[in-house]
Amino acid sequence: MSELANKKCVPCEGNIPPFNTEEIHKYLKKVDGWEVFEDKIDGFHLIKNYKFENFLKSQEFVNKVGEIAEAEGHHPDLWFGWGYARIKIYTHAIKGLAESDFILAAKIDQISNA
């Protein structure tokens, strides 16, 4: 189990700087299969794609992610359909990544590996 999965997401109100690329790569090693993307609007963000055998399995997974997000107070962007789910995580208030993004990714990894 990732040490990050044992931590709690901390609410961010924009009072911290986003991670730099060195910090991002350090934390990226602690989560499984997540990719980092950068865009001009949202800065760096984490993305992971999942495959499932049918629509219901995708929906069940997204519902579990939603429960974790609510419990952590940190909400990813979610897309899903027949046989797939896609998750995008970043901290909106700082337009980039912070430790809480990787904590949420690690918690999601736990349910995807269960």
Please annotate each region the language model reported.
Residues M1-L56, E60-A114:
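Long, contiguous binding/interaction regions
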